[in-house]
Design a protein with these regions (language model features):
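Dynamic "connector" segments at or just before major functional cores
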Residues: 1-205, 209-226
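Acidic/histidine-rich, metal-coordinating catalytic segments
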Residues: 157, 227-239
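Alpha-helix N-cap/loop-to-helix initiation residues
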Residues: 206, 239-240
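A short acidic (Asp/Glu
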Residues: 165, 240-243
Length: 243
C-alpha cells in the first residue's frame, strides 16, 4: 500500500511570506527546486549581472523588467525547459512566478514566448562580450572567497548543440554529422565553475578562438593574482600549432 503524504512542507523564500507546499492538488508545479535556484541566483547576482548588459529594445517600459525577463529565461533553462515555447505554459507556474518577483496567486503572469524571443534577439555582439565579462567577474569573486589561489586549471572544451531549424549561425559539422552550433566552453578544472562561453557557428573547428580567449583569461587572472600558476587542459581537438 502506498503511504500518502498529508503534512504540508514549508520552504524558505526570498519573499516576505511563508511558502507552504501540499500534495492535495490545486496549483501544481513540476519544478520544486526553484526556491533554491532562486536563492542561489540572488546570492551570486548572476541574472542581475546579465540583465545590466542586455539592451533595452522597448520604446516604453514594459510590464516585466529586464532583470525579471533574464531570470525567467535562465531559471527555465536550469529546470530543463530550454525551448522558448515553454514560456507560454510556465508563465503561470506558481514557483517560477515567485522566483521572478510575482506572487503565485496574483493575476499577473510572467512573459510569453514572443517577449522572451525579443529579449534574446535584443543582444548584440557588444552586449554578449559584456555579458561574458560579467560572468568572468562573478567567477573571480567566487574563486577568491577562500583567498588567492596558488594554481588555476583551465579546462577548454567544445560541445555540440544540435539545431532543428534555420537558426542563424547553424552549420553542418562533418564529425558530428548534424546541423549544430559549436560553442567553446572554459571551466575551472578544480572547482567546476564556468569561466566563460563563446557561441560559434556549427562548422567551426574545436580550437577556433581558443588562443585569443586563453590570452584574455590568463591576462585577467594575472591582474587579479600575479603569482597564480595557470595550467591548461584540453583534448585532441585543441592539438594545433597555435595552441
Amino acid at each position: 500500500m502506498n503511504d500518502c503524504v498529508t503534512k504540508k512542507m514549508c520552504f524558505e523564500t526570498e519573499a516576505a511570506l511563508a511558502l507552504e507546499a501540499a500534495f492535495d492538488g490545486g496549483r501544481i508545479t513540476s519544478d520544486g527546486g526553484l526556491p533554491w535556484l532562486s536563492k542561489m541566483d540572488s546570492e551570486m547576482g548572476l541574472c542581475e549581472a546579465i540583465s545590466e548588459h542586455v539592451p533595452e529594445w522597448r520604446k516604453r517600459r514594459g510590464r516585466h523588467s529586464l532583470a525579471s525577463l533574464v531570470r525567467q529565461r535562465v531559471l527555465q533553462i536550469a529546470c530543463g525547459h530550454e525551448d522558448q515555447n515553454d514560456s507560454d505554459t510556465l508563465r503561470k507556474d506558481p514557483l517560477l512566478k515567485l522566483a521572478c518577483g510575482l506572487l503565485p496567486e496574483s493575476g499577473e503572469d510572467l512573459a510569453s514566448q514572443p517577449t522572451i524571443c525579443r529579449l534574446e534577439n535584443a543582444a548584440t555582439r557588444r552586449s554578449c562580450h559584456r555579458i561574458a565579462e560579467a560572468l568572468f567577474e562573478l567567477y573571480l569573486a567566487e574563486r577568491g572567497k577562500a583567498g588567492a589561489p596558488e594554481k588555476i586549471l583551465l579546462d577548454f572544451d567544445s560541445t555540440d548543440d544540435p539545431v532543428h531549424g534555420g537558426q542563424e549561425g547553424s552549420r553542418y559539422h562533418g564529425y558530428y554529422r548534424q546541423h549544430m552550433y559549436h560553442p567553446l566552453l572554459v571551466f575551472d578544472g578544480d572547482t567546476g565553475h564556468l569561466i566563460t562561453a563563446l557561441l560559434r557557428a556549427g562548422n567551426t573547428h574545436a580550437s577556433n578562438s581558443s588562443v585569443a580567449l586563453l590570452k584574455r583569461i590568463a591576462g585577467r587572472l594575472r591582474e587579479r593574482w600575479p603569482e597564480v600558476a595557470i595550467e591548461v587542459r584540453a583534448d585532441a581537438g585543441f592539438a594545433v600549432p597555435a595552441v
